[in-house]
């Protein structure tokens, strides 16, 4: 008889503990805005036990928090290039060659404000002919000529055959074609993944209109984004060939007369 009384008392204590736990859990759910759904109804939101942090938002292309303007919209202060090609008009940097003043050797407008290491660069460009590029982590080659750079380049061209790809001016050549993610090693270049087809990405680039460029260089990972779309990315594991910092610049390419326009230049050091 005493044994039965002890068992009954233990059962009663267990039942009371379960009731208290259930009531506590219900209050906690209500305090957090979570309630059990009615029978037969699926719960809303992510499954319990998973993260409930803020959702992922698209980054606006004109988001410049933490960036600094590297073009004042009026002058070429802080920039260095051949004055016969470069000027400022209507808050826009213009690089222009003519039949009378052709570009004989690829020449660059160089930013003298530093040699960024890890950074993000945003800008807009428009062009009417030939080929150009955004140069970064680059070095000067005075033996070749004044205003000549060697280094990574976000390629742009009027026909958009190469626009968006990663090229190395006066170096290893094509490092990641448009639509590719690559790994660069001393003896070979490998495709890690195909992002999208080159033609699909080409269709996202505007002709005779403004295009937005976003370059991210972080460590040995180099990323090119045009008009909000990932164009090319490379992981440069070639320790002897890669650059981890260097000059920024814009290219005027040899060939027929051309006009390159640049505006809204923003830089953020990471």
For each of these PLM feature ranges, what is it?
Residues 1-13:
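Bacterial N-terminal signal peptides that target proteins for export
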Residues 6-8, 21, 57:
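Residues marking helix boundaries in flexible regions
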Residues 15-24:
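C-terminal segment of classical bacterial N-terminal signal peptides
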Residues 26-270:
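Carbohydrate-interacting regions of secretory-pathway proteins
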